[in-house]
Amino acid sequence: MDAGIGRVKIGIINMKAIAVKPGIKDSVHLVEMPKPEIGVIPNGRGVLVKVLRVGVDGTDKEINNAEYGAAPVGDNFLVIGHEGFGVVEEVGANVTELKKGDYVVATVRRPGTSIFDIIGTNDMTTDDTYFERGINLRHGYLSEFYVDDAEFIVKVPRGLKDVGVLLEPMTVVQKGITQAYEIQRRLKVWKPRRAAVMGAGTIGLLATLVFRLRGIEVVTFGRKPKPYLNSDLIEDLGAEYISTINISVPDYAKQNGAFDIIFEASGFSPIVFDAMQTLAKNGVLVLSSVTGGDRMVEVPADRINLDFVLGNKVMVGTVNANREYFETSAKDMAQAVLEYGDWLSRLLTHPIAGLENHAHLFDTLINAKGAIKVFCEVGEDAGRPTTNSYGQASGS
């Protein structure tokens, strides 16, 4: 495949995309590659999607930092971006659940060979080699178009089109909390009253939202002292924001009580051990942060172990999400719009217009102050300009 920008193959319609060269640090660049066709998907189940917006996050930053990521077999580059949102352009002959003009989001992980992949829960795969669009061995969504099987494409209600780019991050929360409730069926009766969220970034904010939609009292811990946008967003949900600069998580719990469920989304591994010490009896702690490095900490291991054993406590990790969680995320987002108005749109702080501005996109992701969700405005929606959708000009 010819990925050189400006070197167009004769007779092939090309498109632009943002890619990296896996294993090479700071290699993000613009490529030109053939526009995909629905015919590459068997059994008439292909769907061609025009990309409108793609969110970027720490995963994209780490891939560009050459920490992980692999190109598809036969290519020397990986199109990044796993938080895609777009509109259907064309469907195969046997696609009945989608039509041209539908807003959609595609899942990220693709099936492997394990029993979990076979039954549709590829997010629980036991395969050592896995396939994730924009992350590992499959091209992502930071391109003008993509094609996939209808099985992996989820319809988004039109009322969510302005916030649809948040659906994939929402699935991280949705899976973790759903798994926690599934685990707690061991108790026969479990009605959590108090929840804690570790971290006030995008995932922490969405976790706070999901807990509040379920009527649970929430305390969200972040490092930065309030007031700032994230703390305002948390308090607008009726939750409490606490800065760990002012009080530690264990000290807060000693003064105010333990938590029935804790969702960790801080990206700071030592706080996991603080969370373990603030979990109530029969409680469940969900870990969602992917932490590299080799940080070491000293912890009261015997006491933590004793409390977990005597308190019947559970700690579980969660990663990725299958179609089920994309569908339930859309439902929760719709409920959030009804209950909290423009709350979700306030998370979309930094739009960057155009794939050609990839350098600015990554500079914003890495350096922008006050950023919650940085995203690329890739294409236009029915002729509407891709600027000023969120109260500021794209690229600002």
Region locations from a protein language model:
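Cytochrome P450 core scaffold surrounding the K-helix E-X-X-R motif
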Residues: 59-64
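Mid-domain Rossmann-like dinucleotide-binding core that forms the NAD(H)/NADP(H) cofactor-binding site
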Residues: 160-246
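Glycine-rich beta-strand-centered segment in the early N-terminal region that forms part
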Residues: 38-54, 68-115, 157-159
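Glycine- and other small-residue-rich loops at beta-strand/loop junctions that grip anionic moieties
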Residues: 145, 165, 196-200, 221-223, ...
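C-terminal hydrophobic helical "lid"/dimerization subdomain
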Residues: 4-13, 273, 323-396
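Glycine-rich cofactor phosphate-binding loops and adjacent beta1-alpha1 units
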Residues: 183-194, 228, 235-313
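NAD(P)H dinucleotide-binding glycine-rich loop of Rossmann-like/cofactor-binding domains
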Residues: 111-194
